[in-house]
């Protein structure tokens, strides 16, 4: 089978390509960075260093090619492939949507009746459905029936860490370091035609529960570790997780959010606690020096109502579950300052100009004078003296 992947960055090279090539796909990368395109087409291979807490190993990625996303020939590629994946960033989906429309219309003109499945592996809940909406808002009505019959828009959740790596050697320009752990869960009901056989891909008929499990465990713990670590001037996740006080808060916060998930989805408690332990061990991986500023960026998004911090805290209060450590993470996020992060600057200005309560109303969509706001404000002031 043939696959086209948009986004030749770390996730594309370190995760998606690894899985698809292992599953015997013929893979073509597409990207707007001509330097990466040239490197892929010149070398046609690269190495991935897989790392775990106790080992590391090198694997080879071979027989790859690439095409610039602005090259008109990409439409011909779209007209012939069986699978399209993306890991290019949410904002890139608007441009990708336009390219896909042209390529799929070419399939229609070629009278292609072969199903095409599209999976957007982006940092957004149900990113593929988001991409589908962009496409359907743009395409003429006369094409809707073809899209409905032959084009599958498959939502997914992915979980792996591929930290940023820079190399000054030309022969290593495609080299990536990737976590050995990987999880790719897709909605089995959204495929068109036969479901492709992809090694290490989990098929689910209840994707929402897996999405929430990841957001309210991995993302919650990751964010809290970052915001607490930055309060103590740590640089990367490994440094932060070497601090016992941060370890305790992060682990207990994931336990608190876990109780919310168990209540919501009736998860098996023993299994979910085992999942938390697995995530916690990954955070302490000494080989992954993921920068805290990267993890903490975009605090306005991370503090929004349905995101990793506010959602479990509000629901824990609703069900009379513990939230002591979750609120510490929220308070630490509100203290986050980074002059290179536009959202951090906006958050800081909002707190300074309109006060903390109004900020929580506007950013987190909490009700004014609510118990949630009262508890967060109290922790915001106490965490400085209690934690540092």
From Swiss-Prot:
Sites where the protein binds NAD(+): 3-14
InterPro entries: 6-PGluconate_DH-like_C_sf, 6PGD_dom2, Mannitol_1_phos_5_DH, Mannitol_DH, Mannitol_DH_C, Mannitol_DH_N, NAD(P)-bd_dom_sf
Keywords associated with the record: NAD, Oxidoreductase
Catalyzed reactions: D-mannitol 1-phosphate + NAD(+) = beta-D-fructose 6-phosphate + NADH + H(+)
Cellular component annotations (GO), alphabetically ordered: cytosol
GO terms for biological process, alphabetical: mannitol catabolic process
GO molecular function: mannitol-1-phosphate 5-dehydrogenase activity
Assigned EC number: 1.1.1.17
Top-level EC class: oxidoreductase
The family this protein is said to belong to: Belongs to the mannitol dehydrogenase family.
Name of protein: Mannitol-1-phosphate 5-dehydrogenase
Organism: Buchnera aphidicola subsp. Schizaphis graminum (strain Sg)
Gene name of this polypeptide: mtlD
């Amino acid at each position: 089978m043939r696959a086209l992947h948009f986004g030749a960055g770390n996730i594309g090279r370190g995760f998606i390509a690894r899985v698809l090539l292992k599953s015997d796909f013929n893979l073509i990368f597409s990207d707007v960075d001509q330097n990466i395109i040239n490197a892929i087409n010149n070398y046609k291979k690269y190495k991935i260093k897989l790392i775990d807490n106790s080992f590391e190993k090198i694997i080879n990625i071979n027989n790859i090619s690439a095409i610039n996303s602005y090259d008109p020939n990409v439409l011909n590629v779209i007209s012939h492939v069986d699978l399209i994946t993306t890991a290019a960033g949410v904002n890139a989906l608007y441009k990708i949507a336009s390219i896909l429309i042209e390529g799929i219309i070419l399939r229609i003109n070629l009278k292609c009746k072969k199903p095409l499945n599209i999976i957007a592996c982006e940092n957004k809940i149900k990113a593929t459905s988001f991409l589908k909406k962009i496409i359907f808002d743009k395409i003429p009505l006369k094409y809707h029936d073809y899209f409905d019959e032959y084009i599958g828009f498959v939502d997914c959740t992915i979980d792996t860490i591929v930290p940023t790596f820079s190399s000054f050697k030309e022969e290593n320009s495609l080299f990536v370091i990737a976590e050995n752990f990987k999880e790719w869960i897709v909605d089995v009901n959204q495929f068109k035609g036969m479901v492709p056989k992809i090694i290490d891909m989990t098929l689910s008929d209840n994707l929402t529960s897996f999405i929430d499990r990841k957001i309210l465990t991995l993302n919650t713990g990751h964010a809290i570790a970052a915001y607490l670590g930055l309060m103590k001037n740590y640089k990367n996740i490994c440094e932060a997780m070497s601090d016992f006080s941060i370890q305790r808060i992060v682990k207990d916060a994931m336990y608190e959010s876990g109780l919310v998930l168990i209540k919501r989805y009736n998860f098996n408690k023993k299994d979910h606690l085992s999942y938390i332990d697995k995530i916690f061990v990954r955070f302490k991986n000494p080989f992954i020096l993921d920068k805290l500023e990267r993890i903490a960026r975009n605090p306005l998004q991370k503090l929004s109502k349905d995101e990793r911090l506010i959602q479990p805290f509000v629901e824990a209060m609703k069900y009379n579950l513990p939230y002591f450590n979750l609120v510490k993470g929220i308070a630490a996020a509100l203290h986050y300052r980074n002059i290179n992060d536009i959202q951090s600057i906006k958050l800081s200005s909002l707190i300074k100009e309109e006060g903390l309560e109004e900020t929580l109303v506007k950013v987190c969509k909490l009700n004014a004078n609510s118990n949630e706001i009262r508890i967060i404000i109290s922790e915001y002031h106490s965490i400085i003296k209690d934690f540092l």
